[in-house]
Amino acid sequence: MNFYVTSGTPDYMEKLIVKNPQQPLILLHGNGNSVVLHETDKKSIFAVPRKFEVIAQDGQFTQKGYFTFFNMPIMSDERPVFEKKALDVIPALNSNDAVIAYRLLRPVKAETYLFIIQWGGPASYEVWKDSNEYKKE
């Protein structure tokens, strides 16, 4: 499965969503910038996408909730060790009722992995961040 991420101004990203109603796109707004997520087995509809392969997943992203993005630059020779450690975190997320969905993403043409987790809300993320599970990871 391919996963694409693009970013831009809120206005432009909203127009992208309206222009592609048939696509499963998720629009997220942040500090003056917006991000659109697209998961598909086809080519990207974005002009300038960041392309990833999905290596672990659960649930379906929805427009509601709170998203955390973990960007992790990993050199190519360190990828196998990193992926094993990252996959070891998955059972803790699977057992967390506050997690709506997640994707662990391997970069296709870059070195920065992306781990996106959707939570029920910011308080859910804060509780997890303060937990022993998070601290040991």
Report residues per predicted region.
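Short S/T/G/P-rich N-terminal loop/turn motif that feeds into the first structured element of a domain
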Residues: 1-98, 110-112, 124-130
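Short beta-strand micro-motifs enriched in acidic
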Residues: 105-107
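Mixed-charge, glycine-accented linear interaction segment located at domain edges/termini
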Residues: 133-136
